[in-house]
Every structure is written in structure tokens, then in C-alpha cells.
């Protein structure tokens, strides 16, 4: 059952709302504009606030839905987390878009929202504070994501291993941003 859900979650995660919305609304393909990342932050840059919000909601939803379905089917928190990670992997490496995906932060937030909502509040607060101080979305994401791990270790220990893997994936997808941050070239708002 978990494998079937994980496959379905991956396929759902492979839907790139940024790319689909850019096609539906006739705006620039985010993979070819701005930072080149098909996510909400780049959609804000290339297509405006409305499409950025829709992208964010779609990306969060595709992380949340598989976790809720797994819970509804009676799976444990670790299985829920692995199913959610499958959706994030779909976002990172989407089948439908030549495996060119986003950074996974919004989809991971949706997954985390399903697993343990207070962790999303902590991550959102850390993201907002870091962004306010730095005006850099990637830095805010890199600070916020690992901050959820101690809270999960305490409240949802079954999700700790999958969330540690997820944190590593998100850091990996931000490796170019890390290089740019250290070189002083990272984009700011």
C-alpha cells in the first residue's frame, strides 16, 4: 500500500504548477526566466503576485494531500512522511517536465503541514524572519527547513528520519544558491 501511495504521490508531485500556470495564463515559462526555478518565488519575479500565490497553494497542496490520504488509510507517521517525500521528489524531479523541477520548499511545507502543523508555524516564522533580515528566499528556506527537526524529534519522532532525508534533499537542491550566497551573488528582493 505504501509503495502505491508513494508512486501516486510522486506523480502528483510531478505536476509543476508554476509551468502549468505560466502556460494557462500566457506568461513567461519560469524555467526560462528569472532564476530559472519553477517555484512560487520565481513566479513572483516573472509573473506577479497572483500566479505566485496560486503556485504556492498548488505546491503546498500536492505535499499535503498525499500525507492526508496516507493518514486516512491508517498508515503510521513514518509511512505518511515517506509518502509525502515522494511528492517532494516529484516536485524536484518531475516526470512530466523532463525531471527539471523546483527546490521543493513549498511542497515540503505542505507535507509538514499534514504531519505536524506546529512545525510549519515554526518554519514559517523562521522563514519570514530570515527573509525580512536578508531579503533572500533561498537563505530563508535553508534556515527554516532544518529548524523543524528538533521539534519533530520531540513531538513526531517517527517522522525524524524521513524529515532529515527531506532536509538533505532541499539543501542539495539549493547547492547553487549556497555557492552564490558565499560568493555574494545570490538574488535579493
Curated annotation (Swiss-Prot):
A GO biological-process term: phospholipid biosynthetic process
Keyword Lipid biosynthesis (UniProt): yes
Keyword set, alphabetical order: Cell inner membrane, Cell membrane, Lipid biosynthesis, Lipid metabolism, Membrane, Phospholipid biosynthesis, Phospholipid metabolism, Transferase, Transmembrane, Transmembrane helix
GO cellular component: plasma membrane
Pathway the protein acts in: Lipid metabolism; phospholipid metabolism
EC number assigned by the record: 2.3.1.275
Annotated catalysed reactions: an acyl phosphate + sn-glycerol 3-phosphate = a 1-acyl-sn-glycero-3-phosphate + phosphate
Residue intervals passing through the bilayer: 1-21, 50-70, 72-92, 111-131, 151-171
Enzyme type, top EC level: transferase
Compartments, record wording: Cell inner membrane
Main location, first listed in the record: membrane
Family note: Belongs to the PlsY family.
NCBIfam families, per the entry: glycerol-3-phosphate 1-O-acyltransferase PlsY
Subunit structure: Probably interacts with PlsX.
Name of the protein in question: Glycerol-3-phosphate acyltransferase
Organism: Pseudomonas paraeruginosa (strain DSM 24068 / PA7) (Pseudomonas aeruginosa (strain PA7))
Gene: plsY
